[in-house]
Amino acid sequence: MIKYFGILITIFVFSCNAPKKNSLSENNLEMAQSFLDNIITNPEKAKSLLHKDFTFAWMGIIEQGGKIWNKENLFDEYFKNIIPEILPNGIVLKTLDAISDDNGVAIIQEGDAVGKNGEYDNKYVWVFKMKDGLIHSIREYNSDILVATQLYNYKLINTEK
């Protein structure tokens, strides 16, 4: 009996010390955050997290809105040419909250930047869908009004008389 008790205690101790495995939901969240953390500073790392059929779209209704970008042109054109033109001094993004499950992630962020036309402190929601253990798609949501006025120099006009 004492022999069996010793075996049970040994099994219990080793099972308590086993490294915790992350759930698929936690892995998805880590991958999405890693992508956002590396898109400018380490684009090759960010790109390595993307599925071969990856798509990205900013969901605004003005310039660039709804355009579908792929794994190649997202980095070669969008992040290399378009973003530096409208955010010449870059942007600091702070994650406020996140939701994840086995199929995807939503990350809520607040930005701190000066756009080419003035202060640009937008709020963001990034919706990630996962496939085959990689990021399959990202949709970016934020304020069209701030994008239009502070990045593209649109003027707001009061149409009520």
PLM features: what roles do these ranges have?
Residues 32-35, 45-47, 54, 74-75, ...:
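Hydrophobic pocket/interface hotspot
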Residues 68, 117-120, 147-152:
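A short, polar/proline- and glycine-enriched secondary-structure boundary/capping micro-motif
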Residues 93-98, 111-112, 123-128:
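Hydrophobic/aromatic beta-strand elements that line small-molecule binding cavities or substrate pockets
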Residues 113-115, 132:
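Beta-strand elements of well-folded, non-transmembrane domains
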Residues 139-161:
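Low-complexity, intrinsically disordered terminal/linker segments enriched in charged
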